[in-house]
Amino acid sequence: MKIIIEGAGQVGSHLAKMLSHEGSDITVIDDSETRLRQLTTVADVVTILGDPSSIKVLRDAGCARADLFIAVNPLTTQTVNIVSALLAKKLGTKRVIARVDDEAYLIPENKLMFKDMGIDMLFYPEKIASDEIIDMLKHTATTDSMDFARGKLQMAVFRLEDDSPVLDMSVAEFTAAMTAASREVQFRIIAIARKGETLIPKRDTKFNYNDHLYIIAKREGIPAIMKFIGKDNVEVDSVMILGGSEIAEMVSAQLVRHQLKAVKIIEIDPNRCRELSERLPSGVIVANGDGRNSDFLVEEGIRDYDAVVAVTGNDEANILACVVAKKFGVARTVAQVENLEYVRLAEDMGVDAVINKKLITAGRIFKFTLSDKVRFVRYMSGTDAEVLEYTAAPESRITQAPLKDIEFPRNAIIGGVIRGSESFIAVGDTRIEPYDRVAVFALPETVKEVDKFFK
């Protein structure tokens, strides 16, 4: 697959690295020689220096024969991204995607208008991240969660604390004990993230302290699993946000709409504070100060908040702020961490949930590199694996025999199936039927092979 990426910023560079590892032919356009030089040290890509809205540059990049064009430059106006995407489509690129920075563009009628113009998808990384944070504040017992088919199935990620009652249990022992405690709960442990590695567990795999368990079940079964693991879901009614970023602005506005009792933003720049105060609803308190100063946080009442969200734009500051918040007794902490090498560090230091803008955006875009049977793709923080939802095509390989007989890739696992209005956990005797929606957990090197089973 030939893919052209416009923009070698954080998201564009991450996409280039990820997609080049998948074996795609990647060309990156940027007007900064420095950014392009940095990218070539970490990814096998062709680079073109120039204006991404130039027809000559787009022709030189090969838009006439490209399968996918991704306009993802955050350093230009969204107009440049939209213009370059439209030009790429006119020049012959099969599908085009553009980054925007205005929520109004994502209103359904506006998205449809751009679709009619030729842009296949618009995405707004900061909006995606803010939605993820809201979800993390709803599910406080998990480090991450994901719904399939509007909640018919749910995947939850649980970090095992040092006092968890399931430590040293094997998968088989856990399954037997959980089934005995709640016979009606169907579930499957589909992966374990341990010390930076992702394991597809076997029956004799034992649970260790700080393991992250990836469990899929019907939504109504998650509370019983949570209780068995020793987790409690805390009702979040007050949130302190450190940093007055664009993400902070969107999160705080959503929280007020959800009628939380208290929402406060701590921002060091007085000009940004004034701007936020003017733009946000009256239910959001904006305080000018340094979120790295623990004395200041105490003065602002950090101990009285149910959750702290750190989105300052500095990974180290976000992680440390969440660690300090936990010491003050805050029940739920969420940190924005853009350096992938710091994600595991943040989790090891006790941060409850980590948001990575590059990862969640990459999942939305990676879907376009697979077959049209993929409904969505999600990268999970703390693991290098991907979660995908497929629709099984008639006559596809996945429908030809029970799962135990189809030689599914070894580093992938089918977690659950949605068939009409019913959902169930997949087992060896399960036979996938045409048009079933299937939840798959896969390591990156197997995704292309998994894709072939559903075509």
Give the residues covered by each predicted segment.
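Cytosolic regulatory regions of ion transport systems
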Residues: M1-K455
